[in-house]
Curated annotation (Swiss-Prot):
Keyword Cytoplasm carried by entry: yes
PANTHER family for this protein: SIGNAL RECOGNITION PARTICLE 19 KD PROTEIN (PTHR17453), SIGNAL RECOGNITION PARTICLE 19 KDA PROTEIN (PTHR17453:SF0)
Species assigned in the record: Saccharomyces cerevisiae (strain ATCC 204508 / S288c) (Baker's yeast)
Compositionally skewed regions (Low complexity) per UniProt: 55-65
A GO biological process held by the record: SRP-dependent cotranslational protein targeting to membrane
Coiled coil feature spans: none
Record's protein name: Signal recognition particle subunit SEC65
Residue numbers spanned by region Disordered: 25-71
Quaternary structure and partners: Fungal signal recognition particle (SRP) complex consists of a 7S RNA molecule (scR1) and at least six protein subunits: SRP72, SRP68, SRP54, SEC65, SRP21 and SRP14.
Presence of keyword Ribonucleoprotein: yes
Location within or outside the cell: Cytoplasm
Molecular function per GO: 7S RNA binding
Keywords, ordered alphabetically: Cytoplasm, Ribonucleoprotein, Signal recognition particle
């Protein structure tokens, strides 16, 4: 009999932090930034702390503050996305041990090759990272919400979550209920998302900055040739107002061909004698 082996997906290949243009060298995607070389002068790299008339203490304080970062997490009491206290880069490295889940894992319009990880009966239309976070919170598993991160195959739907599922190779906390590993967890998340389908009102539950106060919540038209959802977060590059993708929705103007100028022919008068 063939031997079946359990695949440990603790180190997820989709846990990527890189520019989209690095994955798309042809730069055919609407938001792929063109990588251009930059020239940096040596005098621009001088440390201002060693220049005369500057305060070295203030510079050291700024450096220490720059080493701190914040994370978004789901408050288990309120169910809302809240910001954590500033954490060091060392603690941030510990967070990267969490396993990653993307919305495209549950997209019913995608094939397994295009990013779907669950069976079609557990997939939904327009999956959102916030709904995934609500599902994990209901299961009692620690969850971190990263609203800006996105899967390279689903760059128009920003958002992903990190879950603390294993530690030292062992299931911990509420995750011990999922002996089947990450696949069983994704099945439970898919069942939750089937019970809570995505609507326009779902977008209001996602935290935004003040720049999005006057933006209307609505569905967006699909573009032929792109795998995209109709309901995406307001900070999605697929929105029609986004300067990087606005041209995708505009019909190109067809300019009439210019008429070529032909010089008049010389006329000759024939005189008969």
């Amino acid at each position: 009999m063939p031997r079946l082996e359990e695949i440990d997906d603790f180190n997820d290949i989709d846990d990527l932090d890189m520019e989209l243009a690095e994955l798309d060298p042809s730069l055919r995607t609407p938001i792929a930034p063109k990588i251009t070389p930059k020239v940096v002068r040596s005098q621009d790299q001088e440390n201002p702390a060693f220049l005369p008339g500057t305060n070295n203490n203030s510079n050291s304080n700024n450096n220490s503050s720059n080493e701190k970062e914040q994370l978004s997490f789901i408050n288990p009491k309120t169910g809302k996305v809240e910001r954590s206290e500033a954490i060091s880069k060392k603690d941030l490295e510990e967070v990267k041990r969490f396993q990653v889940l993307y919305p495209c894992y549950f997209d019913i319009n995608r094939s397994h090759k295009e990013g779907r990880r669950v069976p079609k009966e557990l997939a939904v239309e327009n999956p959102l990272a916030k709904t995934m976070a609500d599902a994990v919170r209901e299961l009692g598993i620690l969850c971190i919400f990263e609203g800006e991160k996105c899967h390279p195959q689903d760059f128009g739907n920003p958002g992903r979550i990190r879950v603390l599922f294993k530690e030292n190779g062992q299931l911990i906390g509420a995750a011990t209920k999922f002996k089947g590993g990450k696949r069983q967890l994704m099945k439970a998340v898919g069942e939750y998302m089937k019970r809570h389908p995505t609507t326009i009102e779902s977008l209001r539950e996602i935290p935004y900055g003040p720049d999005f106060d006057n933006i209307e919540f609505k569905k967006i038209p699909r573009v032929k040739g792109f795998k995209m959802n109709e309901i995406v977060p307001l900070h999605s590059p697929f929105l029609m107002g986004h300067p990087m993708t606005k041209s995708v929705y505009e019909t190109p103007k067809i300019t009439a061909a210019e008429k070529s100028f032909k010089p008049p022919k010389n006329k000759y008068k024939v005189v008969r004698r």
